[in-house]
């Protein structure tokens, strides 16, 4: 088929559809943030000291599509795609396209526009990319064997925003929304040579991005694009990411071809029911569906395998229908699994996974196969509710056990308590007798999440979006998950659902990250609500069905910061009760059984986190987070690096954060250059991020059940709200978080100097010892105290004693050491302190440079020794190219930004997919490199 003739036939059709896709504003909209009504004045835009270096367009090459096998009967259509603007469809001006990928991804890959992550390059990319239609196309061949199959289908796992799908000159149908799959039958149209074309339509309300600068202020946090949810609403621009010029439209997920003998599987979920508190067996219920695309009823045999467990079931599937299939232990006793390996979140056990292998046998042929990964885990939630006969009732809600009651809670019937905290009511017709009442141990009214009967002290962070240009490949995302696991995090919040993808959930499963999963709406009363609730519900339903088998997902939440509209609240809660019997629908990311979110700014006195903020479950708390100088140099041109420039502001250094920047000069002395600023600010980053987590540690199970950073992960090169930088580099914020979140931990509360041991593991600690020692900057001991024979039960906190710091002068270090009965050090936690009458840490600058020596202990372990007579401060490690000194990323180190006393040794571990030399640097340490 000739593509030129094909597109000529579609010219008038494309115009009509584009016109029909227009939407009018909702007349009853109460929210106010429509974003900018027009582009901001030129004089308020950020300016760079150097012009943008525009790339050269890469010459197009002929590339034929090759179908990449994914399973026995599934192929991925990746290579050979082309893309062009809709008004150039009749020309030769096509690009080799990146699929999966967005429109902008292709244009950057092909050298049309510069890398938007660098400097102010994003401003040089035209805004009208999100106001144009685009076409994708590819050609592929099918073998006689594939053409002989009874059924051939195309699966689109994610487009944005809308798409028409054309195959061999015929329109197959349309897809609307960024998170719904499209499934199209091509059985009667497929030939030896095939042409596939996709017409991409942008959202009707793309909005106008606000460009951050010192003159324009911080981002406006969205705008008109929120009307078009389900989509990536943050791509209009937020205060942590600029507007993405194409709004992430395109074929952003993979396209697959599936061949069967006419009977195929739908989405599958394995429901695991444990006899809690016992976990010695699990009842497995398999929920799936079978679809018969043939014109006659078919008797099939469903065969299943889970490890050593096998089962079969004969099923009749009526012609042209899709039927639900439920397999349970009552009918198949082998689905009662003995001694299962449980899926547990990071720090509480291993995230064990099983594969359910299903085959559908039709006669002597296998029609379809499917592999579903699942974990044996059961969720429950402690929270406070109102019942008709009792207010403030503390209950444990197990969605699986309570499913027969219908929807347990009515989130439209809320009691407002002090501080804006809301208590939900039991649904109409339910009372105390219907629920599991538990004692109030001081945690009322706050939410507690339990996995397999174990309370989980939730610590982690928000992902505003996985990647600004939606590179959601496993290769790109997995290092971030390794960093989260090694930071001892156990929860990621999928903020406004912007990180929804198969790879995201797969990696959460594998690395033990609980997922708080939002849908695609933001702040109630500020951000706009979606115009098309039917479209929203179709996407939401598909997400719940598609990803419901992932054990990591712990809650569904309708929006960020607020409740859904009354109609969406009713529809979402009913849908989730029907489609997912294992999880809680949580109606609000704050307020309902939660504390108010925030703060998001730097605290001059980190003790305020303890005295004011630390209570309940907080879904967002954050502080600025400037990365290392090495990462900054990859982020912007040298001329914009110092002094702080417009480019810093464009990369999220917001107005109102002056105190964070000023704190560097105030506490550590005026920064002389970029390197000086970045090495000094890491003290602030470490202390701030450690304090946020340690403040919640101080009230674990007394008044606190969880805290999530805003944010743990950056969507692009940023100087704000992150624990690591986009390039996988770790710095003070990361290691401060990692220290505070270690499963066995000793800390000194900054508000009252109480010394506390935290044990978030499932095993008790016995005969432990805690030593507190104060040192001056030369490493001279000033005071000491030790406590022995300490027992700390599993999953608990123990307050020990108050550190006696009165009378200490100048700058000094408080060192806490937790060791076991044999004297083995479990953890060390150091605090740099200001004594009476001391306002800063400028004395650090007068400490003589320390010398350190490294030696290799094993393939992955290195010993570092302080061979000088004073403390070596803020030691940081990197893997580097021994010839050039260039930092190699990712590389994972067991510790960083710690201090060594004179003569002290410390062993670190490193692992990386690359090889190189180990380099150590420090605040008062000259760089030292150990070649491997």
Residues covered by each model-derived region:
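Alpha-helical transmembrane segments and their juxtamembrane interfaces
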Residues: 14-15, 630, 914
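Short hydrophobic alpha-helical membrane-anchoring segments
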Residues: 14-21, 625
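Short, conserved micro-motifs enriched in small and acidic residues
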Residues: 345-348, 679, 683
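Active-site-adjacent bridging/hinge elements
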Residues: 226, 659-668
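Alpha-helix initiation and N-capping motif
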Residues: 91, 248-249, 629, 657-661, ...
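Substrate-binding/catalytic cleft of secreted carbohydrate-active enzymes
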Residues: 427, 434-435, 439, 491-655, ...
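Secreted/periplasmic carbohydrate-active enzymes, especially glycoside hydrolases
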Residues: 1-11, 20-467, 471-491, 700-704, ...
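Short glycine/proline- and acidic residue-enriched helix-loop micro-motifs
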Residues: 668-679
């Amino acid at each position: 088929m000739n593509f030129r003739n094909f597109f000529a036939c579609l010219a008038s059709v494309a115009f009509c559809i584009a016109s029909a896709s227009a939407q009018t504003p909702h007349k009853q909209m109460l929210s106010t943030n429509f974003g900018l009504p027009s582009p901001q004045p030129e004089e308020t835009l950020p300016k760079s000291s150097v012009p943008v270096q525009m790339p050269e367009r890469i010459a197009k090459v002929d590339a034929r599509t090759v179908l990449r096998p994914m399973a026995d009967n599934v192929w991925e259509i990746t290579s050979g795609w082309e893309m062009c603007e809709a008004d150039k469809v009749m020309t030769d001006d096509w690009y080799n396209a990146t699929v999966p990928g967005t429109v902008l991804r292709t244009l950057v890959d092909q050298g049309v526009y510069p890398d938007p992550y660098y400097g102010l390059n994003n401003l040089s990319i035209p805004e009208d990319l999100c106001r144009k239609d685009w076409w994708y196309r590819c050609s592929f061949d099918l073998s006689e064997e594939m053409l002989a199959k009874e059924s051939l289908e195309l699966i689109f796992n994610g487009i944005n925003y809308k798409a028409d799908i054309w195959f061999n000159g015929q329109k197959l149908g349309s897809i609307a929304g960024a998170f719904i799959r499209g499934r199209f039958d091509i059985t009667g149209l497929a030939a030896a040579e095939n042409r596939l074309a996709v017409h991409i339509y942008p959202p009707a309300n793309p909005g106008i991005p606000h460009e951050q600068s010192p003159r324009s202020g911080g981002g406006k946090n969205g705008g008109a694009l929120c009307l078009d949810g389900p989509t990536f609403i943050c791509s209009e621009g937020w205060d942590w990411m600029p507007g993405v010029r194409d709004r992430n439209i395109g074929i952003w997920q993979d396209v697959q071809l599936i061949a069967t003998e006419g009977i195929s599987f739908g989405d599958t979920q394995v429901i695991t029911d444990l006899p809690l508190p016992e976990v010695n067996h699990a009842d497995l219920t398999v929920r799936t569906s079978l679809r018969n695309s043939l014109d006659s009823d078919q008797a099939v045999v469903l065969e299943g395998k889970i490890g050593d467990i096998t089962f079969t079931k004969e099923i009749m599937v009526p012609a042209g229908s899709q039927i639900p299939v439920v397999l349970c232990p009552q009918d198949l006793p082998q689905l009662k699994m003995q001694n299962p390996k449980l899926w547990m979140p990071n720090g509480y056990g291993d995230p064990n996974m099983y594969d359910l292998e299903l085959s559908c046998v039709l006669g002597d042929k296998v029609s379809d196969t499917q592999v579903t990964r699942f974990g044996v885990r059961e969720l429950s939630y402690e929270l406070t509710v109102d019942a008709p006969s009792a207010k403030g009732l503390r209950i444990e809600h197990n969605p699986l056990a309570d499913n027969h009651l219908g929807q347990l809670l009515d989130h439209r019937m809320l009691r407002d308590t002090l501080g804006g905290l809301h208590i939900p009511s039991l649904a109409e017709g339910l009372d105390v007798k219907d629920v599991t009442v538990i004692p109030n141990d001081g945690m009322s009214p706050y939410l507690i999440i339990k996995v397999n009967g174990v309370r989980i002290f939730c610590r982690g962070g928000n992902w505003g979006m996985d990647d600004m240009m939606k590179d959601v490949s496993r290769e790109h995302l997995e290092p971030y998950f390794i960093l989260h696991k090694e930071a001892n995090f156990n929860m990621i919040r999928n903020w406004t659902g912007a990180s929804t993808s198969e790879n995201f959930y797969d990696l959460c499963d594998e690395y033990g990250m609980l997922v708080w999963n939002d849908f695609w709406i933001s702040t109630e009363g500020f951000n706009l609500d979606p115009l098309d609730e039917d479209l929203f519900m179709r996407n939401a339903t598909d997400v719940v069905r598609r990803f419901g088998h992932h054990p990591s997902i712990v809650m569904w939440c309708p929006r960020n910061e607020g409740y859904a509209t009354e109609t969406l609240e009713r529809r979402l809660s009913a849908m989730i009760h029907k489609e997912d019997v294992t999880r809680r629908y949580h109606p609000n990311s704050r307020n309902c059984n939660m504390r108010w979110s925030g703060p998001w700014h730097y605290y001059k006195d980190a003790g305020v986190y303890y005295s004011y903020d630390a209570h309940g479950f907080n879904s967002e708390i954050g502080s600025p987070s400037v990365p290392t100088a090495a990462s900054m140099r990859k982020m912007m041109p040298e001329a914009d690096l110092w002094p702080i420039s417009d480019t810093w502001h464009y990369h999220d250094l917001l107005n109102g954060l002056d105190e964070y920047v000023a704190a560097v000069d105030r506490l550590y002395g005026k920064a002389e250059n970029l390197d000086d600023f970045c090495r000094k600010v890491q003290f602030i980053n470490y202390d701030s991020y450690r304090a946020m987590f340690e403040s919640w540690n101080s009230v674990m199970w007394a008044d606190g059940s969880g805290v999530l950073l805003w944010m743990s992960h950056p969507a692009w090169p940023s100087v704000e709200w992150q624990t690591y930088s986009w390039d996988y580099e770790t710095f003070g914020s990361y290691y401060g978080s990692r220290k505070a979140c270690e499963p066995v931990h000793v800390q000194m509360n900054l508000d009252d100097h109480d010394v506390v041991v935290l044990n978030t593991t499932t095993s008790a600690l016995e005969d432990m010892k805690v030593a507190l020692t104060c040192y001056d900057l030369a490493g001279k001991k000033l005071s000491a105290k030790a406590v022995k024979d300490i027992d700390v039960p599993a999953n608990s906190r123990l307050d020990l004693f108050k550190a006696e710091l009165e009378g200490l002068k100048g700058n000094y270090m408080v060192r806490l050491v937790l060791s076991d009965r044999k004297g083995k050090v479990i953890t060390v936690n150091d605090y740099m302190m200001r004594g009476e009458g001391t306002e800063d840490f400028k004395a650090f600058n007068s400490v003589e440079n320390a010398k350190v020596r490294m030696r290799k202990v094993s393939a992955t372990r290195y010993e570092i020794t302080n061979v000088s007579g004073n403390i070596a401060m803020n030691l940081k490690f990197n893997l580097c190219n021994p010839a050039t000194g260039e930092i190699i990323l990712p590389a994972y180190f067991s510790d960083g930004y710690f201090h060594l006393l004179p003569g002290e040794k410390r062993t670190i571990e490193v692992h990386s997919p690359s090889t190189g030399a180990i380099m150590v640097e420090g605040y008062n340490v000259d760089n030292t490199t150990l070649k491997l």
